[in-house]
Amino acid sequence: VNYEKIKISSKEKKIKIDSEQEIITGSFIKSFGADVVKKYLSSSRINDALINISSSTITGLNKRKKFWKVIIEDPDDETKDLFLLKLSNKSISVSGNNNSFISINGENYGHIISPKTGFPGKNKLLAVISSSAFKSDVFSTGLYNFSGCDFIQKINSIDDLEGVLINEKREIFYSENFKDFILENYTK
């Protein structure tokens, strides 16, 4: 987890890492692919589409010229919903440790690692909305380990991002305009 051992050379277009490290691109390649598919469909004059690739979803207008409805599930109980969102020409990416973890001696260890501790992050869920699947995916992982207050400050400072963070105490933190996407809020 020592990012300081990663050397990036823009001039040489190379990345060097320590022999004990690896960079796994699967975390963002799917969202990059979703943006490529969206661009292809758009160039083919297909604007009525919903593209779902794992935890990244891109929406266009549906055939009734209405927004798409997207559900964010409760990270502790997937039979319950937290939000019903309305999205049009946007992407949403949801990150969390609820579905991707390993259990050791009764303790669940998630796949999103805190760069500060080297251990799995404790937040329950983070969802990010953007016009780009790649951007929403990268930020939903990148902001995952932030505290609620730091999350709000950071996400509100970046153009074309809205989101919601649910911490380990199940406290909910919204970006400034996230509420504009909410059709139903089941957390009340």
What are the roles of these predicted feature ranges?
Residues 1-188:
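Mature catalytic core of soluble alpha/beta enzymes
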